């Protein structure tokens, strides 16, 4: 769980900025977006295979 303690003399905006950075670093927002809607295991596998194929094609193009 991400948490931020407000230091003496620290503004709310600075504390909020630190909290957002910690959330981003922990991957909380991307995890929330990923879990927002249920995705069947077969769909997950297809997306994963497609992403791997795209990475391979990109890597091939880069090597030429």
Curated annotation (Swiss-Prot):
Domain of life: Bacteria
Nuclease listed as a keyword: no
Keyword Ribonucleoprotein assigned: yes
InterPro entries tied to this protein: Ribosomal_bS21, Ribosomal_bS21_sf
One GO MF term: structural constituent of ribosome
Chain segments carrying region Disordered: 37-64
Pfam families: Ribosomal_S21 (PF01165)
Ranges annotated as biased composition (Basic residues): 43-64
Descriptive protein name: Small ribosomal subunit protein bS21
Species this protein is from: Anaeromyxobacter sp. (strain Fw109-5)
